[in-house]
């Protein structure tokens, strides 16, 4: 697509949303509590702020404001307001305090922001634990959130990823013609490295006429030792390893396809 000469600012909003899952098996209630505490500390508000700050650097956005919060008993949230235009570093506020009033921020928040929320959880009896991170990178202008794909998936050690990319609104060229998208895309996969794509099974569900693109990813290789918390495969019987492998694989399939799978 040739470069457009626009009339005024690029008014297209480009949003990339992730659900990233980490799956684990913890045998006892204490182990499950231990996993939740571990993952909660591993992805606390400070660590997530570091990840999102680097994301801003990757996509070429300028940070205006950071709001972050750890929650009791678990979970964290970080929201960063960004702009396309350079800002004076002396005007950037990253301290922890209440942000601007809604009247001062709502117009900007509708355009460009990066946010993440985390959701650790566990099965009450089955030993299965999951950690989900919801991430949204929404930009207005020429900045593309797709540049952050590989970095975010890698940083959050993802077993399963579901992604949505959508372009909303329109912008006008100098002749007054409306443009509802300003770049070529037929799949989110085209913006991933070959190394990343080789690690995952992938499936697309795209609605091209609406500029909506959806991709699901699940790790190809399954190694039980990477999914056990406070345990090693050699400490388990063959029957136990088979049972846990079945539980984990079923859990991953259900999350990947978004539906419960009945036992046969």
From Swiss-Prot:
UniProt EC number: 4.1.1.50
Cofactor(s) required for function per UniProt: pyruvate
InterPro entries: AdoMetDC_fam_prok (IPR003826), S-AdoMet_deCO2ase_bac (IPR009165), S-AdoMet_deCO2ase_core (IPR016067)
Protein name stated in the entry: S-adenosylmethionine decarboxylase proenzyme
Free-text comment on the cofactor: Binds 1 pyruvoyl group covalently per subunit.
Record PTM text: Is synthesized initially as an inactive proenzyme. Formation of the active enzyme involves a self-maturation process in which the active site pyruvoyl group is generated from an internal serine residue via an autocatalytic post-translational modification. Two non-identical subunits are generated from the proenzyme in this reaction, and the pyruvate is formed at the N-terminus of the alpha chain, which is derived from the carboxyl end of the proenzyme.
GO CC list: cytosol
Pfam families: AdoMet_dc
Site label Cleavage (non-hydrolytic), positions: 111-112
Disulfide bonds: none
Pathway(s) of this molecule: Amine and polyamine biosynthesis; S-adenosylmethioninamine biosynthesis; S-adenosylmethioninamine from S-adenosyl-L-methionine: step 1/1
Organism this protein belongs to: Yersinia enterocolitica serotype O:8 / biotype 1B (strain NCTC 13174 / 8081)
Domain of life, per lineage: Bacteria
Gene3D superfamilies noted in UniProt: S-adenosylmethionine decarboxylase (3.60.90.10)
Residue numbers bearing the Pyruvic acid (Ser) modification: 112
């Amino acid at each position: 697509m040739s470069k457009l000469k626009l009339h005024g600012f690029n008014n297209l909003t480009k949003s990339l949303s992730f659900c990233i899952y980490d799956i684990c098996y913890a045998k006892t209630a204490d182990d499950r509590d231990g996993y939740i505490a571990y993952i909660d500390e591993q992805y606390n508000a400070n660590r997530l702020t570091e990840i999102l700050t680097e994301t801003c650097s990757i996509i070429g956005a300028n940070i205006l404001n950071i709001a972050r919060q750890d929650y009791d008993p678990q979970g964290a949230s970080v929201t960063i307001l960004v702009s396309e235009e350079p800002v004076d570093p002396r005007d950037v506020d990253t301290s922890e305090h209440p942000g601007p009033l809604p009247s001062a921020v709502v117009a900007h928040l509708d355009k460009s922001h990066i946010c993440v929320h985390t959701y650790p959880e566990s099965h009450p009896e089955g030993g299965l634990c999951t950690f989900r991170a919801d991430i949204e990178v929404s930009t207005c202008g020429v900045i593309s959130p797709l540049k952050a794909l590989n970095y975010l998936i890698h940083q959050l050690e993802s077993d399963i990823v579901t992604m949505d990319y959508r372009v909303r609104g329109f912008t006008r060229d100098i002749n007054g013609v409306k443009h509802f998208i300003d770049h070529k895309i037929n799949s989110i996969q085209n913006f991933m490295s070959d190394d990343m794509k080789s690690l995952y099974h992938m499936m697309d569900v795209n609605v091209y006429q609406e500029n909506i693109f959806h991709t699901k990813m699940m790790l190809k290789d399954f190694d039980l030792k990477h999914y056990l918390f406070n345990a090693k495969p050699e400490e388990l019987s063959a029957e136990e390893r088979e049972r846990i492998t079945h539980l984990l694989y079923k859990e991953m399939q259900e999350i990947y396809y978004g539906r419960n799978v009945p036992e046969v």
